[in-house]
């Protein structure tokens, strides 16, 4: 189930990149957020209640973080191979796991990840989009904030209701950006169909699979399995998008995967999905 979730998310990201020429990265974000929110709303509508006070503040903040992470990550995807972008973004959950640990040995994971990131940023001696690297790292920092805020939201608004409302808020936030880039092309049948696929693959399906997996697996095992995501992204990018990686980039991704697995196993807590 965890592997299925990972493959679903990365397939959704690969599908989203096919929309970039028509509606731009931000148009694709609008499709993902909008259809993802509608899918969640279908499951939570009957039990949904309006937030108030602290709940409302946590929901709005969570929605803003979701919007920022997706906008920056999809811009990074427009400039970098899928595997590279996802690997760089993974500094978020890795950082949260390490900062939450008080063990000095966890600095080893930081060092491993740092080497991997430097190798990726260097592009293996070839051309690399520096802005894409920066955007992916910003998205990773946002994912770290997402993890922290996810815990806060879960305490203030238990269940999927808070996430559903946050996704709706994120959709409202990204709408001006998506409409500015996508324009009338967002209303075409092919874009809407692909957007629905992105929303389901990137949000609804992985959430369902991960919730079921968390009921069956220890947190540490779940976290280690989730750390395979950069490798899965590289594989999907190679198969679906014909994105070849240099040997040094493969090694760099392997270093970040190893660092993430070690840090998440040590922390013993899973990294929530970033929207």
Locate each region found by the language model:
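Transmembrane alpha-helices of multi-pass small-molecule transport proteins
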Residues: 21-68, 94-96, 142, 146-149, ...
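Specific transmembrane alpha-helical segments of multi-pass solute transporters/efflux pumps
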Residues: 8, 44-85, 117-119, 199-217
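Membrane-interface interhelical linkers
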Residues: 1-4, 37-61, 102-108, 125-126, ...
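Specific alpha-helical transmembrane segments that line the substrate/conduction pathway
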Residues: 27-30, 34-37, 66, 73-104, ...
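Juxtamembrane helix-entry segments on the extracytoplasmic side of multipass membrane proteins
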Residues: 22-26, 30, 51-56, 122-145, ...
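Helix-helix packing/entry segments at the starts of transmembrane helices
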Residues: 86-88, 149-171, 203-239
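Glycine-/small-residue-enriched transmembrane alpha-helix faces in small-molecule transporters
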Residues: 1-27, 64, 68-72, 115, ...
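Hydrophobic transmembrane alpha-helices of multi-pass small-molecule transport proteins
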Residues: 91, 105-124, 236, 248-267
